[in-house]
Amino acid sequence: IVLALSACATLPPLQEMSNARQTIAAAKEMNPMTEQSEKIQEAERLLSRAERRMEVNLYESARQDALRAQKEAIEFIEWAISQSNDRKQDD
């Protein structure tokens, strides 16, 4: 049982990486100014670090970076939506 659990813990975080990439892509589609956003820059930096960590089998660290990258992108999306709603209310 212990071997089975440790094997699960060392699997590459492929789904987390994919989720982060998709969330970053969605954020970029929402707003043309996304590239200049500190949140998106941080998300991309974390995703790059996750990719490097995955290459050297640091899967748990890579998983954490991918999750943080996705979180940064989600926070940007939430901010962009609130900005859009604020502009609509001003009209």
Identify the residue ranges that each predicted region occupies:
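Sec-dependent bacterial lipoprotein signal peptides
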Residues: 1-8
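Long, charged/polar, soluble alpha-helical segments
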Residues: 8-91
